[in-house]
């Protein structure tokens, strides 16, 4: 089990093509603060191949079929359904 499973579950349940969340909302779902790197580096939000990564945070959005599009200045991330 990953600390990012609640985020994955939220995305699995989402019926729309995209979901915009404040970083604070993501933190509420996972029950803890995001790492500093999520606030400082777009790379933390990388859309890695779920078959080739060990990064549990990336798996939270790639396994349900989303791409993360962060806006670090606004402290938001938009998850867009791939396809």
Roles of regions detected by a PLM:
Residues 1-19, 34-83:
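Ser/Thr/Pro-rich, acidic low-complexity intrinsically disordered regulatory segments
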């Amino acid at each position: 089990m990953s600390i990012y499973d609640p985020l994955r579950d939220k995305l699995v349940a989402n019926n729309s093509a995209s979901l915009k969340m404040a970083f604070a909302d993501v933190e509420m779902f996972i029950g803890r603060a995001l790492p500093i790197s999520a606030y400082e580096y777009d790379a933390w939000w990388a859309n890695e191949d779920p078959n080739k990564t060990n990064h549990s945070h990336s798996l939270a959005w790639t396994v349900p079929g989303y791409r993360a599009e962060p806006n670090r200045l606004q402290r938001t991330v938009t998850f867009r359904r791939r396809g």
